Amino acid sequence: MNMRKINFTETVLRDANQSLIATRLPYDKFESILETMDKAGYYSAEVWGGATFDVCLRYLQEDPWERLRKIRAKMPNTKLQMLLRGQNILGYKHYPDDVVRKFVEYSVKNGIDIIRIFDALNDVRNLEVAIDETVKQGAHASGTICFTTSPVHTLEKNVAMVKDLQKMGVKSIAIKDMAGIMGPKDAYDLVSAIKDAVPELPVVVHTHCTTGLAFMTYLKAVEAGADVIDTAISPFSGGTAQPATETLAYALRQLGYQVDLDDKVLVKMADFFKGVRADFLADGTLDPISMATDTQCLNYQIPGGMLSNLISQLKMMNAIDKLDEALAETPKVRADLGYPPLVTPTSQMVGSQAVQNVLAGERYKVVGKEIKAYCRGEYGRTPAPIDAKIQKKILGNTPVVKGRFADSLEPEFEKTKKELGDKAKSDEDVLSYIAFPQVAMAFFEDRATGFKKKKEAAPVKPAAPAAPAAAPAPRAPFAGPVYYAAVPVPQTPGYVSRAIQPFAASYQPSYLKMGDREDCTGNFTITIDGKPYQVSVAKADTPTAAPVAAAPVAAAAPAAAAPVAAPTPAPAAAPAAAPAPTAVAAGETPVNSPMPGNIFKVECKPGQAVKAGDVLVVLEAMKREIEVSAPVDGTVKSVSATVGTAVNTDDLLVVLG
């Protein structure tokens, strides 16, 4: 019997929840289990990096650095691991070398022991600085291959990359199969080749269950000599996440391998995370699509985190019916762009571009700033040449980058620290701002107020259905202000404006009464019949007549009390989250938003002369910056766009004359 020891890395606090619930796992949801996890006997726990940093700032009202420090304090006996995107650190573009070094330094200072470092294009030039600084800080640098398949990805190229990583000083080699497309033979052949090339380096294997291959892949990888595998505690395993920790531990012991995990601790962990999973299922964050086995992923190669985010983004755009089209478009975009492995940030770029191609009805009509930078060579050397016609359509006459792009970037850390002044309370804040300027600044401002604004603007959910009543009594007139939420519901022909009580949600309204508290205006996410909608709430005129009882709910609708009608809002009270399309005078050219998003920058002002192609407005959408350019030469007549405002497709941004 082979008694070789196999180590386990637990992913529930990072990649498993990133894959299944788009990283929406707040610290207070898992704090109470950390000390128990620390006793499980894991080789390491992946707790940071990837999308956790962005999501903490953007959605969870958490300082990611503080989150890491708290985990470190609760888990002193387990090596903490993070995922770093090489020269991209945890952002979506390349950063100067001084920023990369500072980020690694402070990651280690705040508690990280192992840094798994990868580049989305497998360009080793983008790994050098991060690996060098990790070694200098005394941490474990795990050099990573992003596994993918294409006409240009070969076993020989992977082995050559491994040898380059060894020369850089890595302490292990990780194989990152972000889409779950590595089959058992792929794993056996690749691990065997790596072990032959660099026998002194441990090999770590990471995959996803998306296609159903993962368990077989891990067993063959271990047979070939893999030393560590990534798994997730069972309630957060499967689907787009990793295989179950308990199952692999059981199987490997049966095959004669040594596994030093404490099964009793694993049971406690599983019981705890069953409750967490149930909460996310109940509120719709955990989508059944992410839990399913999808063999089509063998074709479109979308990784777990990318798939859950793609679903979330399409839902927010009320375009989930376009999911199959977006998935089919993804491999086409990937081929156009030179077969990049689909891992952050290229997965977001390729996936978002596929969505835009589908929604716009024309391929590459709308192109994000990041895609332009990619085509210019700012992300590194592509595995294969970019389609020349596509590159020309995207770049025009813009020249491409020669050499390593980071060599052309000026140092940024000290300059930014000085500019921020007392807005940044620490060097960690400076790094957060450099990675995500707008998001971090909004976080700093919210933090200064104790997150008061976000607490007041908490998501509003419809009230539970009331008990049926044969003849509900008319409600007394309400004397205070009434608020209505504009809800874009495609099922409602013509978007008929109608104000109803929350318990009548099955009517799929265009306007939903939000309540009568002192101030409930602003942007919200509300859930109607289990579907989230982005809404903006504006104040309506005070109703002057008592609400009148309406007809009972139709039999096809869920059982509920008869809804009470409310006055239809006056036109003046119609809510608007953003500039709405308006008529323009003859000879003027409207410039509308190509997609839903937030106004990130306004690059023009009234009276300014512009030429076709000049950037007028920059949107932030799907974690990317989308430049909206002038379609013709002209003069800016008016600007409707305001920084920070939410916009929908076709909302008017600028008028040119």
PLM regions and their residue ranges:
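N-terminal amphipathic alpha-helix/helix-capping segment at the start of soluble metabolic enzymes
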Residues: 1-21, 68, 73
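Hydrophobic faces of well-ordered beta-strands that scaffold small-molecule active sites
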Residues: 8-13, 43-47, 78-85, 115-116, ...
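Conserved, mostly hydrophobic/aromatic
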Residues: 16, 117, 173, 225, ...
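Terminal or standalone catalytic/regulatory effector modules within metabolic enzymes
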Residues: 38-56, 291-297, 301-532, 536-547
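Active-site beta->alpha loop and helix N-cap motifs at the rims of alpha/beta catalytic domains
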Residues: 49-161, 180-183
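Catalytic cores of alpha/beta
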Residues: 157-162, 211-224
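Long, low-complexity intrinsically disordered segments that are proline/alanine-rich
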Residues: 465-475, 545-586
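Structured functional modules or segments
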Residues: 573-657
